[in-house]
């Protein structure tokens, strides 16, 4: 597994210069130590004054919106097929499955968001209006200490239509630009993910000012399996995974990150690819919807002490 450089050389992407602002040896300092620089895009494109002005004005206060689907019974959107919405609801709310989803939310999906170096973001957590009260109450208790989380309940509906509506409803000002990302309930992102999203927009302002949508892909990360015998993981280059994939949306644009299949974003808009540091963990578990068709198991290796320290510092995954 990768080893972080000496802590004395630590620095964090996001405008702090060469000095790490966090205590030496702290979790955030260790993340800073393994972060690499963001490569700036060229800024020599001609830009329209009105659009560029609106984009620049929105950089500092740009809203960042994440979408987490927590066992929402959508019509479509699953690779596991069901003959009726009732069958889908029964599958999603089965006790064994729900226990696994809560465990992954508690240990993987939420800790990394609690420790974001930039805590200014919104996480819309979409649930079904049929979610049993015991699960709704448990979810509310789980995120009670996270003011960023908004739990939204919706009736079953066409997957993409519901997701697009939820994201657009979450925009505080549709006439201002925003950044969007998806966050599955079994994945983690680096604790500087939101910080780096905003930094990338600033670095690539010339490109972004000329487009309605631009994808931002942090394409290096881990595939991992977490169990009683430790964490087994493989670091790799995975372009356009759901995890750590963001999208800029221009002022007034109603398109969302859910308008597009994540692996096809590059067909519809410019994309900024940042492969410099591990930015996500995608877990393998008993109910990975995207792995239901016999996907080949990657070559996972058990993390040693250095690997466990990186998962702790970078992703807030602790075992």
Feature annotation, model-predicted:
Residues 4, 16-22, 32, 37, ...:
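Short, low-complexity intrinsically disordered segments enriched in A/P/G/S/L with frequent Arg
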Residues 57-107:
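N-proximal low-complexity "stem/linker" segments adjacent to membrane-targeting elements
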Residues 110-120:
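Short, acidic, metal-binding catalytic loop of nucleotide-sugar glycosyltransferases
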Residues 121-130:
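Short beta-strand/loop segment that forms part of the nucleotide-sugar
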Residues 136, 145-178:
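Active-site-proximal specificity loops/subdomain of glycosyltransferases
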Residues 158-172, 190-264:
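Conserved catalytic core of nucleotide-sugar-dependent glycosyltransferases
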Residues 176-188:
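Short beta-strand-to-loop acidic/aromatic patch adjacent to the donor-nucleotide binding site
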Residues 238-319:
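C-terminal catalytic/acceptor-binding lobe
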């Amino acid at each position: 597994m990768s080893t972080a450089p000496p802590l004395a050389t630590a620095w964090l992407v996001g405008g702090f210069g060469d000095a790490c602002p966090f205590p030496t040896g702290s979790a955030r300092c260790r993340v800073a130590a393994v972060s690499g620089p963001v490569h700036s895009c060229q800024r020599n494109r001609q830009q329209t004054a009105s659009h560029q002005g609106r984009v620049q004005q929105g950089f500092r206060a740009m809203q960042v919106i994440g979408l987490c689907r927590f066992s929402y019974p959508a019509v479509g959107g699953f690779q596991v097929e069901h003959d009726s919405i009732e069958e889908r609801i029964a599958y999603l709310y089965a006790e064994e499955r729900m226990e696994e989803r809560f465990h992954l939310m508690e240990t993987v999906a939420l800790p990394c968001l609690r420790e974001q170096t930039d805590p200014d973001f919104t996480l819309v957590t979409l649930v079904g209006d049929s979610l049993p009260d015991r699960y709704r109450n448990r979810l509310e208790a789980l995120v009670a200490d996270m003011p960023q989380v908004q739990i939204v309940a919706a009736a079953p509906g066409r997957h993409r239509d519901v997701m697009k509506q939820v994201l657009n409803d979450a925009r505080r000002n549709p006439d201002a630009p925003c950044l969007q990302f998806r966050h599955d309930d079994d994945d983690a992102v680096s604790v500087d993910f939101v910080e780096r999203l905003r930094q990338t927009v600033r670095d690539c302002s010339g490109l972004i000012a000329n487009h309605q949508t631009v994808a931002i892909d942090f394409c290096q990360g881990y595939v991992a399996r977490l169990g009683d015998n430790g964490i087994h993981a493989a670091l790799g280059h995975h372009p356009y995974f759901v995890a750590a994939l963001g999208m800029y949306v221009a002022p007034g644009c109603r398109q969302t990150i859910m308008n597009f299949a994540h692996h096809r974003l590059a067909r519809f808009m410019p994309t900024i690819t940042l492969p410099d540091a591990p930015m996500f963990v995608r877990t393998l578990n008993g109910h990975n919807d995207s792995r239901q068709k016999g996907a080949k198991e990657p070559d996972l290796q058990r993390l040693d002490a250095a690997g466990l320290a990186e998962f702790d510092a970078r992703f807030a995954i602790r075992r």
